[in-house]
């Protein structure tokens, strides 16, 4: 073993097993790319993204931590969302919640 080395278990790692999901169609109506990180409160993303924000309230992308999804101008794509977990409190972002969900 090398100091700092990570030895992962063999086989596939499944993320967010059993978490309820919501799939939404998202369109970038702006003229600039928009990138959304894995743990960003999806309902509070850039206003240039067009989708059902009520369905996205309290949700984040169902992607590995530290990764992101990029929406090019004019692009429409499906995303899968899962609930934010833990205390289910949201602070910051676009300051649209600032407390419990």
UniProtKB/Swiss-Prot annotation:
One of its GO terms (biological process) is urea catabolic process. One of its GO terms (molecular function) is urease activity. The keyword Hydrolase applies. Gene3D superfamilies: Urease, beta subunit. It catalyses: urea + 2 H2O + H(+) = hydrogencarbonate + 2 NH4(+). Keywords: Cytoplasm, Hydrolase. GO terms for cellular component: urease complex. Its main location: cytoplasm. The keyword Lyase does not apply. It is found in: Cytoplasm. SUPFAM superfamilies: Urease, beta-subunit. Pathway: Nitrogen metabolism; urea degradation; CO(2) and NH(3) from urea (urease route): step 1/1. Its EC number is 3.5.1.5. Pfam families: Urease_beta. Belongs to the urease beta subunit family. NCBIfam families: PRK13203.1, urease_beta. Heterotrimer of UreA (gamma), UreB (beta) and UreC (alpha) subunits. Three heterotrimers associate to form the active enzyme. This is Urease subunit beta. It comes from Rhizobium rhizogenes (strain K84 / ATCC BAA-868) (Agrobacterium radiobacter). The gene is ureB.
């Amino acid at each position: 073993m090398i100091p700092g080395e990570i030895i992962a278990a063999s086989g596939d790692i499944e993320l967010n097993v059993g978490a309820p999901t919501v799939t939404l169609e998202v369109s970038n109506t702006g003229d600039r790319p928009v990138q959304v990180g894995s743990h960003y409160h999806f309902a509070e993303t850039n206003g240039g993204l067009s989708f059902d924000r009520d369905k996205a309230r309290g949700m984040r992308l169902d992607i590995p931590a530290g990764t992101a999804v990029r929406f090019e101008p004019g692009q429409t794509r499906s995303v899968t969302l899962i609930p934010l977990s833990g205390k289910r409190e949201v602070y910051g972002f676009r300051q649209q919640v600032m407390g419990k969900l």
